[in-house]
Design a protein with these regions (language model features):
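GHKL-type ATPase core
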Residues: 3-27, 43-169
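ATPase catalytic-site recognition across NTP-hydrolyzing enzymes
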Residues: 31-32
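Conserved helix-loop functional segments at active or binding sites
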Residues: 35-44
Length: 169
């Protein structure tokens, strides 16, 4: 779909197991992560800890400000392929689908279509700017990680921050 964004990670996948949210409702872990606020463990401010992120708020806001948000993950432990979509800013939650993955390699793929109307953006005129922004952020990510980073299925040919800086000299 025009204006859709996907992020793919070939790591071990999200654990596909039943758990309970704060009110005791049973659901699968990916739904808890992406569809429930206050679902993490990083809320006790009196504890010393070293963590990244802001309690999952980035992923939750992405769901809330999307027309369509889909999580697809293949759990390396359970070998289950989990797919679920959240629509219209988390007002519609599709039931998850699960299937056995056999011998496929684990991964997680997040796809979403931002609610461009909510942001008062014309998708056709904004897309070139968005593409350039995402490409720039992808190059920056490649400069700071040891992972292979791709943009639109093309590998980013830098491995270090120094490689990134050389682009501007």
């Amino acid at each position: 779909d025009e204006g859709s964004i996907s992020v793919y990670n070939n790591g071990p996948g999200i654990h596909v197991e039943k758990t309970k949210n704060l009110s005791g409702t049973e659901m699968y872990t990916p739904q808890l992560i992406f569809g429930e606020f206050m679902a993490g463990s990083n809320f006790e401010d009196s504890q010393d800890r070293i963590v990244g992120g802001q309690n999952g708020i980035g992923s939750k806001l992405t769901v809330v400000f999307s027309k369509l948000f889909t999580v697809e993950t293949l759990d390396s432990q359970s070998k289950q392929l989990y797919k679920q979509s959240f629509r219209e800013g988390l007002t519609i939650i599709d039931p998850p689908t699960l299937e056995s993955s056999g011998t496929k390699k684990p991964y997680t793929k997040i796809s979403f279509i931002p609610d461009y109307v909510e942001f008062k953006l014309n998708v056709k005129t904004f897309l070139p700017t968005l593409r350039k922004l995402l490409e720039t952020r992808t190059w920056q990510a490649a400069a700071y990680t040891s992972a292979k980073v791709y943009y639109n299925e093309s590998i980013i040919p830098i491995k270090t921050f120094e490689d990134f800086c050389q682009m501007f000299t």
